[in-house]
Each structure stands twice: as structure tokens, then as C-alpha cells.
């Protein structure tokens, strides 16, 4: 993050994955994992490789006062305001790069080619809304899929402490 003036914060994020060149198109063995395909066939007991570019995003937050912020975010690819943060975007996953078993079912939007989010934080509450491309990336892990902005989501969060977030 970089300060912009006295009340602004600008952020650029990039995340790359070397899954595809290292592991091949059908990924790596992971018992009980399912939910993806390779060359039209379901991957069973395997984790698919992620796209080379898992996130390229920019965000800006502006403090109106100590209790109120407004913010915007654009990702191509990025992550919309839908559910909890996907495993690969959490700081806690830094030393555990394997996908959890529920990854395909709970983190379906973690690499979304086209995300625009705006939101407001008031004290411990935050509401944000996203328009995004509502589909998984295609099987070509090196390209940028077409942005469609055909899905929408709203997320309300409450943070009673700095270590706890409820949605």
C-alpha cells in the first residue's frame, strides 16, 4: 500500500502461479479433490493447475473521517466480494500452498477475469458490492479470459475485533 495524500491509500497486487508449467495440465494428486476438468474430462483426486496470473489488481481507499472510508477495486483477474477470502489470497496460506478439499466448491471465484468492487466502511461494518465475470477460467492457464461482468454480489462484514470478521 502507498499513501496518497493525507487520507488515501493506493494498492497494486499481483499474484502468479507456476502450477501449469511445473505440474502440467492435469495438476497434481490430491486425494478426494474434484470439481475441474482437463481436456474435457473430470479431474478426480487431482488439484487442477491455477492460471499463471491469479491476480492483477488495483485498489484505492479514501478516509472521509476516522469512522468512514470509501473504496474501489478492479481486478483482471481478481476476487469479488463473495463469501470469505479464498485460500490462496489469505496470508495464512503462505506456507501451505496446497488447496483445501472444499476449494472448488467454496472458492469458485478466486480467479475471476473481470472484477469491479466498490464499498463503504463505517466503524466496524463494511458493505461492498461487486460486478464480475461469473464463471471459472478456461483450461488455457496462460491467457486472459474475456471480461463479461455478468454476475453481481453484495457482502456485509462486521469486525468486532482486529482478528475476527463475520459475514
Describe the residue ranges of each PLM region.
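Residue-level signature of outer-membrane beta-barrel architecture
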Residues: 2-4, 60-62, 119-122, 157-160
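Repeated loop/turn-to-beta-strand initiation elements of outer-membrane beta-barrel proteins
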Residues: 6-12, 66-70, 80, 120-128, ...
